[in-house]
Amino acid sequence: MSNINKEIECCPPFDPAPWDDKIVEWVNKPFVKDKVFTIFYMPVRFGAAIRRVDKKVTKAAAKMVDWLCLCDHTSKWNMDVYVAVDKEIPDAHNKLLSGKFYSKVYEGNFNNTGKWCQDYTGIVKEKGLVIKKMYMWYTTCPKCAKKYGKNYVVIISELV
């Protein structure tokens, strides 16, 4: 992928500190939307979707911001992905997100996702916040998670 530092095989290392237990406000933050086929919520050819987006981003002389990729599991068979970019990308489905978002970082095997979502929902309620839309950010592919020794997943929700 052209936007990745050549020393990094695939996914850049992830620093959880800026994302753990944080509220951020976005005003017209640009994203590019793509889709990934899933089988019972498990993505199939996720990397192909990222490569499609990267090709369009590179062609537009743009950048993927923080490798932020919000995943919206719309059904057992589909996941919409929103990749943060630094400008509008021609020939892409551009989407602007605005609002307050709460993020919490989790680490471990993907089969813990259900537990993480329950924990996250509890934390949000304890803080007196209300979720409008929940996204998952899988910060590295399984191969890179193994290489780095950590599998960070960030749950990010748009708040009411």
Model-based region annotation:
Residues 1-160:
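A solvent-exposed interaction/effector surface
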